[in-house]
Every structure is written in C-alpha cells, then in structure tokens.
C-alpha cells in the first residue's frame, strides 16, 4: 500500500497492558487528509495522489495556492504532499474526498518519516560518536579533534563522505517498522510504539511498513 497519511507529532506518553507492562508510545494527530489532485501518466508522467492536511489562515495563502485548493473544492491546508501509486492503487478516490486514520485499522506496523531536530554545527564526537583523544600524556590541544582525515600524497585528497564536523540534524529521517498500538478514529489519533523523528508539532508522513 503506497497511500499514506500526513500527521502531526503530539508527543510521547506510555500506556499499560493488562499485565501491567509499560509501553512507550508516540501520539500522532492525523486529521483527515483532503485529496487536492490526482496525477496521471498521461498528464504528469507518473501516477500519484496529492493531499493536504490541517488548516491555514486565508491571508497566509497566496493566489496560486488558493486557486489550487478552490479548484479541488477543499479547505486550504498547511502544505501539499504526494503519495506515488502503483497499479490500481487509488481506485475510487476522487478529488475532494478525505483519507482518515482508519486506513491503518488493519495495519500492524508503519514507517514514519519526519524532520529531525536541528542541532546546529557540531563536532565529530557529538555528530558521529567518535572517541575523544587522551586528556593528558602530551595532548594539550586535541582532546576532541577528529584526527587524521586522509593519507598522503597519494591519493592527495579527502574522500567524499568523510565524517567530519558540520551541520547535525534538521534532515528527513525515516523510522521503519513501528508497531501500531492503537487507532483512535474518533479523535483522529494514531499511537505507535517508540519514538518518531522531530519535535512535537512537526509534520510526519505515515505509511504501511515495507518490511512488515
């Protein structure tokens, strides 16, 4: 199933089983997603389902976006997302219809993608879990230095992908195969076991697990 749902991370809590076992869960608010466009091979070169979620003040929506939402006959949302479709997926779904959290009622595991918390510019120890160097015994300036970053005249360069200091976080991260603990259709809530990327209030993309 390629069709997913756009939600918003509320935060973490825990629930207890009948045996008294504590299960850490992340609460995701997944209000009904409104279909704004159906992309097809004939017109767009690929097949996909475009949706919006949440709401946005009218004075914060530009004319192009306002026209797009009006054409679909839906209320303006806080963004636009697409789900690629395969084969006959998406049959029966029309522009203006809604997709709710109930699509996961029979799903046992999901993949959740979000934007991780930004940590700014960080050194190699924090960013890549490097070991620090000696605190003494001749070392006075390089306690948290990464060490050598290359070899010699040959190859005479630093290889691409070398783990060094730099921007940490604030990138898209996907956590796979999270157990679905509870689906609360009445309150548009989805509870999954464990944590998901990002800070509370951040948008997340929920799909059925590909490795389930």
From Swiss-Prot:
GO terms for biological process: translation. The modification N5-methylglutamine is found at residue 153. Residues 134-155 are annotated as: Disordered. It comes from the Bacteria. Pfam families: Ribosomal_L3. InterPro entries: Ribosomal_uL3, Ribosomal_uL3_bac/org-type, Ribosomal_uL3_CS, Transl_B-barrel_sf. Methylated by PrmB. One of its GO terms (cellular component) is cytosolic large ribosomal subunit. SUPFAM superfamilies: Translation proteins (SSF50447). One of the primary rRNA binding proteins, it binds directly near the 3'-end of the 23S rRNA, where it nucleates assembly of the 50S subunit. Part of the 50S ribosomal subunit. Forms a cluster with proteins L14 and L19. HAMAP family: Ribosomal_uL3_B. PANTHER family: 50S RIBOSOMAL PROTEIN L3, LARGE RIBOSOMAL SUBUNIT PROTEIN UL3C. This is Large ribosomal subunit protein uL3. It comes from Pseudoalteromonas atlantica (strain T6c / ATCC BAA-1087). The lineage of its organism: Bacteria, Pseudomonadati, Pseudomonadota, Gammaproteobacteria, Alteromonadales.
